[in-house]
Curated annotation (Swiss-Prot):
Chain positions recorded as ATP binding sites: 15-22
Keyword list, A-Z: ATP-binding, Magnesium, Nucleotide-binding, Transferase, tRNA processing
Lineage: Bacteria, Bacillati, Bacillota, Clostridia, Eubacteriales
Task of the protein: Catalyzes the transfer of a dimethylallyl group onto the adenine at position 37 in tRNAs that read codons beginning with uridine, leading to the formation of N6-(dimethylallyl)adenosine (i(6)A).
Entry similarity comment: Belongs to the IPP transferase family.
Domain of life: Bacteria
Binding site for substrate: 17-22
Naturally occurring in which organism (per UniProt): Pelotomaculum thermopropionicum (strain DSM 13744 / JCM 10971 / SI)
Protein name, entry field: tRNA dimethylallyltransferase
Length: 314
C-alpha cells in the first residue's frame, strides 16, 4: 500500500438464497480481476454439491474460488475457524494484486470478516450446557424460540435443528448477559478494509417461485442419490452438515418418515423460511447497497452495475 492509512479493498455480494449471488460474483470477478471467497456454511463440505447448489467447474469460469470443499461432512467447523482461514485467504489474494470478493448468504461468516469478534471470551459451563442439551432433545423449536426472544439477530440466522449453535448462543447469553451477536473485540479496530457491500433482492413471491424451481432442479439433478451416497459412506443423519437444507428432508424421505412429494414440499417451505431469516439478518447492515433483481435484464447487467459502483471506491 502506498500509505499507512490506506485500507485494503473488500467487495461483498450477499443476499438471500436463490438470488444468483454465485453467478453475479463470477461475472464481477471477471470484470475487476477478482477471486471469490465463499461465505456459505454449507459449501465448506466435500461431497455435498447438489443440495448446497455448489458452483460447478463450468460455473466458476476459471475464476479462483476459496473456502469451498475444505472439510468432510463429519468434521467440526465454526465461525472462528472460518474467520481465521478466510482472512488468510484474503491476505494472499491481495498479495497477488487481485480483488477479494466475498460471496454468500451466511450472515455470521460475513460478520466475522467485517467485524472483529471475540468468539471464545464467554467461556463455557458444562452444567448449563448439559441442561440446554437435554431441553434441545425434548424440543429444539422451543429452545430456538427462547433464543429468538433474547437474541433475534442470531436466531434469524440459525435453523432450529442446528441445536449445537443455538445452545452455544444461549450459553453465551446466560454466562455474560449479552447476546453472542454483540460480542465485539473492543481492544482493536475493525479489519482494515475499504468495504463495499451489495445485496441482491427481489419481490418475495418471485423469490419463492425461484426457490421452488431450484428445489425441483436439485431433485432432477440427483439430490436423493447424493444423500444416499453420504449415508452409505457412514455419515450420520445427526451431523450438523446432514441437518442442512435439502439433506434432512431427503433423509426423512429415505427413512420412510415422509413421501417424496411431502419431502419436496417441506424442503420448499423450509427454504422459503430460510430466505426470510436471511433477509431479517441482512437488514441490520447499513453498509449494504441493495440491488433489486427485477430492475436488471440479467446477471450480466447486475455485475456491470456493481463494477460501475466500484470505480474510484475500491
Amino acid at each position: 500500500m502506498s500509505s499507512e492509512n490506506k485500507k485494503e479493498p473488500l467487495l461483498v455480494i450477499t443476499g438471500p438464497t436463490a438470488t444468483g449471488k454465485s453467478e453475479v460474483g463470477v461475472l464481477v470477478a471477471e470484470k475487476l480481476g477478482g477471486e471469490i471467497i465463499s461465505a456459505d456454511s454449507m459449501l465448506i463440505y466435500r461431497g455435498m454439491d447438489i443440495g448446497t447448489a455448489k458452483p460447478t467447474s463450468a460455473d466458476r469460469r476459471g475464476i479462483p474460488h476459496h473456502m469451498i470443499d475444505i472439510v468432510e461432512p463429519d468434521q467440526d467447523y465454526n465461525v472462528a475457524l472460518y474467520r481465521k482461514q478466510a482472512m488468510a485467504v484474503i491476505k494472499k489474494v491481495l498479495e497477488r494484486g487481485n480483488l477479494p470478493i466475498v460471496v454468500g448468504g451466511t450472515g455470521l461468516y460475513i460478520e466475522a470478516l467485517i467485524r472483529n469478534y471475540s468468539f471464545g471470551g464467554a467461556g463455557t459451563d458444562k452444567t448449563l450446557r448439559k441442561k440446554l442439551q437435554k431441553e434441545a432433545a425434548e424440543s429444539p423449536f422451543l429452545l430456538h424460540q427462547r433464543l429468538a426472544k433474547i437474541d433475534p439477530a442470531t436466531a434469524s440466522q440459525l435453523h432450529p435443528a442446528n441445536t449445537r449453535r443455538v445452545i452455544r448462543a444461549l450459553e453465551v447469553y446466560y454466562l455474560t448477559g449479552k447476546p453472542i451477536s454483540n460480542f465485539k473485540r473492543l481492544d482493536e479496530p475493525d479489519p482494515p478494509f475499504n468495504l463495499l457491500m451489495f445485496g441482491l433482492t427481489m419481490e418475495r413471491e418471485a423469490l419463492y417461485r425461484r426457490i421452488e424451481k431450484r428445489v425441483d432442479r436439485m431433485i432432477a439433478m440427483g439430490l436423493i442419490e447424493e444423500v444416499q451416497n453420504l449415508l452409505q459412506r457412514g455419515f450420520s443423519p445427526r451431523l450438523n452438515s446432514m441437518r442442512g437444507l435439502g439433506y434432512k428432508e431427503m433423509i426423512s424421505y429415505l427413512n420412510g418418515t415422509l413421501s417424496l412429494e411431502e419431502a419436496v414440499e417441506v424442503l420448499k417451505r423450509n427454504t422459503r423460511r430460510f430466505a426470510k431469516r436471511q433477509m431479517t439478518w441482512f437488514r441490520r447492515y447499513k453498509e449494504i447497497r441493495w440491488l433489486k433483481i427485477e430492475n436488471f435484464a440479467d446477471c450480466e447487467a447486475i455485475a456491470q452495475e456493481i463494477a460501475r459502483c466500484t470505480e474510484g471506491v475500491l
